[in-house]
Regions:
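Long, intrinsically disordered, low-complexity accessory segments associated with secretion
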Residues: 1-228
Length: 228
């Protein structure tokens, strides 16, 4: 019959900076800047559980501290390729769930660090576990990209086709990305290429992409059902 209060934050313990959880693999796409109504204590956020709970000796128990329904979320596929990344065989794309913690069109709350488990209802209406990932303490207004696993029927094969020296420290590299889809419906794969840095230019591309940072280029690649 205990009252429970969850405190979210990263306190120092005298032995250097410590983290209770490492951030998930790219869980926060963009950090939010919104303020909510949660009670704060210094740099910490407090999450009191609404009802008392009883926990037996050595028992593990799940309790709810956030109940939001109808929040929009989008399931996508993603593949991130490192600089000069080339694979002899096709690699599985990541299954990614994207959502927002913003007040408008999102969860409308800050999230404490921990593991998020994702369930999806099957054809019979039964919830089935489809993956999990850890997140760091997340401010409200953030854009989240939660990787829940790999899609073995959506593949990407990056290939370095040619690399030519153009000067003492200048190179021209030609890349090819081959995407295949063994699913009965069309999909879109968010393809990212890392390692471009500030002096790298993309001079030719078969699909228009976007430079999202100094070292990252992204393309949204539509792949037909049972096609490539």
């Amino acid at each position: 019959n205990a009252r429970t209060l969850l405190v979210a934050g990263d306190p120092a313990n005298g032995g250097g900076r410590q983290r209770g959880f490492a951030a998930g693999a790219g869980a926060i796409d963009a950090a939010g800047t919104e303020s909510g109504t949660r009670e704060r204590l210094g740099d910490y956020y407090l999450y009191p559980l609404a009802a008392r709970t009883t926990i037996a000796d050595a028992q593990q128990k799940q309790v709810s501290f956030l109940d939001v329904q109808g929040t929009p979320a989008r399931a996508t596929y993603e593949y991130v390729n490192g600089w000069l990344g080339s694979s002899a065989e096709p690699m599985s794309a990541s299954s990614v769930l994207k959502f927002s913690t913003s007040r408008q069109g999102g969860l409308g709350d800050q999230l404490p660090a921990g593991t998020i488990r994702v369930y999806m209802r099957d054809a019979r209406g039964d919830p089935q576990f489809i993956g999990e990932n850890r997140i760091d303490h997340t401010p409200m207004g953030s854009s989240m990209a939660l990787r829940t696993g790999e899609a073995f029927d959506v593949k990407v094969r990056p290939t370095v086709e040619q690399r030519t020296r153009k000067g003492a420290d200048r190179w021209e590299t030609r890349m090819r990305y081959t995407l295949t889809n063994a699913r009965p419906e069309a999909v879109t794969v968010d393809l990212a290429q890392l390692g471009l840095w500030g002096d790298t230019r993309v001079v030719q591309q078969s699909l228009e992409g976007r430079r999202v940072s100094a070292e990252r280029m992204e393309w949204s690649v539509p792949v037909a059902a049972n096609g490539s």
